[in-house]
């Protein structure tokens, strides 16, 4: 999810918090972490240095992950997670290169796998709370291919054509495609300036409403399966769009559903915070530290704060 960000505070902060819960950090030597002739370093000192917000974030994340693991451990398949990792390894050019990429992010292979598992738990939670029907998925998604002729944003750009030339070229291609739509892929491979999709005969896969340029989306969702559009102008240039037949809908349905759930959470973070609150109630969560409780309630479980910050403490520590 876009709203997921890395946790920069070590999880050991949670251990410090637990040591401070239910007691004053100055009324017991048990709360002294380090002693010296110059004075002691207590849990309270360390918490003050790190900051309550970060400790609340870390401890809430740790608690939430424990709850999610308990609730959804039987629904998450480790074999599928291993398959995800193998896929990533191939994308990075092998195990060693993937391992180096993880190290650059401060991750180990085990930690990465743990993050994937936690992400899967969150998906299960949101799937429980946000219901999306097959008809809604079909209404909000469209399988598409396109041919793009880029327009230069400035004369010095190496890629693309000036607006007039780009439009003229797109119109010529559209006429060619209209004569024989079965050659769309062949023409896309040869003419499209979107090199990523051109390699795949112009295929974009499934496009969701709200995911792309508004003019592109408007034109695409007007098309019937198999139809080809007129020339469409977008912020990227000129397109010829084809609505592909969704023959693989059933196999792609779950992935599309997860993306739509993600969109809903982006638009309305209250869906996520309400799901978290339900979990806290279900598992009788009791915050022993009033300050930590205040931070969690005011910031982590506050949908308005999530909108402003674009990140949730409860789903931190995940990198995919």
Curated annotation (Swiss-Prot):
Write the signal peptide boundaries: 1-20
The record's catalysed reaction(s) read: [protein]-peptidylproline (omega=180) = [protein]-peptidylproline (omega=0)
- GO annotation, biological process: protein folding
Residues linked to a lipid group, S-diacylglycerol cysteine type: 21
List the protein's name: Foldase protein PrsA
Location (main, coarse): membrane
Domain PpiC: from-to ranges: 139-245
Bilayer-spanning residue ranges: none
> What EC number(s) would the UniProt record show?
5.2.1.8
Indicate the family of this protein.
Belongs to the PrsA family.
For this protein's source organism, the top of the classification is:
Bacteria, Bacillati, Bacillota, Bacilli, Bacillales
Gene3D superfamilies according to UniProt: 3.10.50.40, Porin chaperone SurA, peptide-binding domain
Q: Where is the lipid attached (N-palmitoyl cysteine)?
A: 21
Q: Where in the cell is it found?
A: Cell membrane
**Which terms in the Gene Ontology molecular function aspect does this entry carry?**
peptidyl-prolyl cis-trans isomerase activity
Q: Region annotation Disordered: residue ranges?
A: 159-198
